[in-house]
């Protein structure tokens, strides 16, 4: 599942996907920041 525009994944205007940054999905589970179709978001 990919949830775009996860604010916690964006630091200083850049998506933190390359550093395997953790993030919280809307379901409450922990995911990892990712980029999909040019959007930064949280993915599990």
Curated annotation (Swiss-Prot):
Is Disulfide bond one of the keywords UniProt gives this record?
Answer: yes
Sorted keywords for this record are: Disulfide bond, Gamma-carboxyglutamic acid, Neurotoxin, Secreted, Toxin
Assigned GO CC terms: extracellular region
Under the GO molecular function aspect, what terms does this record hold? Answer: toxin activity
What does the record say about tissue specificity? Answer: Expressed by the venom duct.
Transmembrane helix as UniProt keyword: no
Origin superkingdom: Eukaryota
Q: Which residues carry this modification: 4-carboxyglutamate?
A: 7-8, 24
- Report the record's disulfide bonds: 9-33, 15-40, 23-42
Protein's cellular compartments: Secreted
Q: What is known of its domains?
A: The cysteine framework is IX (C-C-C-C-C-C).
The protein's name is Conotoxin Cl9a
